[in-house]
């Protein structure tokens, strides 16, 4: 079976932050065995000592912890996709989510009160950084609390990259979860129309193209046509106006109304959104070195 040398070099580089030439040599000296190559790099002092605190953590994973009255969504970042898929890392992210759920902490100012396995949250993250060998960063969390006659829904994509929480009126847990699943899949920017900046609404209205005969219609009909056009545009990015992914004959707003329910709150995370990633063209770099 042929050895995928490029993939092996990429893996060792991601795990060690070693230089390209050193990584290539370590694999050659170790008969292309990744674990032996890492040992070779360590024993020969070739692993870069770049400060982890200065490196960018743009990969990572999400986790959700939930009970009947509270739900927590947390994002923790790492440097590489390799670590993001690591079971030890994913288990640690879930451990943090569970601790946040139990702590009843609702804001960043109180995070120092969270204790995990006898240490503070910051210490837990620092220990994880030391154990895994990459910069691990606690990025953010959000919690929703259900009051009387309210229910929470939660959905996390199997790859741990997308998660959503919703709160609705009533006690229909399946409905709440379906709306959370929709929010995760359809990526709304806002929950409610009244959250959309007025300037953006005006831009959408200005984009309206009058249909033939529009000027001859009564004012109330013109207003309905204009509102219909606006609602169609809002449906692209406002949760309550979006067509329900399971039954697109209903908007989320109407779906909940038919179930005597109401959308109260929602939040959606995607790992790394808003973080500028450092992109390395491993293929080009490896090809250049392999030809030397």
Question: Which role fits each region the language model picked out?
Answer:
Residues 2-292:
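N-terminal assembly/interaction segments in proteins that build large macromolecular machines
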């Amino acid at each position: 079976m042929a050895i995928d040398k490029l993939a092996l070099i990429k893996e060792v580089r991601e795990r060690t932050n070693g230089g390209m030439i050193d990584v290539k040599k370590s694999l050659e000296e170790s008969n292309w065995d990744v674990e032996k190559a890492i040992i070779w790099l360590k024993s020969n002092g070739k692993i870069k000592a770049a400060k982890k605190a200065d490196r960018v953590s743009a990969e990572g994973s999400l986790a959700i912890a939930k009970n009947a009255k509270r739900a927590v969504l947390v994002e923790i970042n790492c440097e590489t996709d390799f670590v993001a898929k690591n079971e030890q890392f994913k288990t640690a992210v879930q451990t943090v989510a569970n601790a946040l759920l139990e702590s009843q902490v609702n804001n960043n100012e109180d995070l120092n009160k969270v204790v995990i396995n006898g240490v503070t949250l910051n210490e837990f993250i620092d220990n994880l950084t030391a154990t895994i060998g990459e910069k691990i960063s606690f990025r953010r969390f959000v919690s929703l609390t259900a009051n009387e006659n309210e229910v929470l829904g939660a959905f996390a994509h199997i790859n741990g990259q997308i998660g959503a929480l919703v709160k609705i009126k009533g006690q229909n847990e399946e409905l709440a979860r379906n709306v959370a699943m929709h929010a995760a899949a359809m990526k709304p920017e806002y929950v409610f129309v009244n959250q959309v900046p007025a300037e953006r609404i005006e831009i959408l209205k200005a984009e309206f193209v009058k249909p033939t005969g529009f000027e001859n219609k009564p004012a109330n009909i013109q207003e309905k046509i204009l509102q219909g056009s606006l609602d169609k545009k809002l449906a692209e990015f406002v949760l309550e106006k979006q067509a329900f992914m399971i039954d697109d004959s209903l908007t989320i707003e109407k779906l909940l109304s038919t179930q005597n329910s109401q959308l109260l709150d929602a939040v959606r995370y995607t790992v790394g959104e808003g973080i500028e990633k450092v992109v390395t063209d491993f293929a080009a770099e490896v090809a250049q070195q392999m030809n030397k």
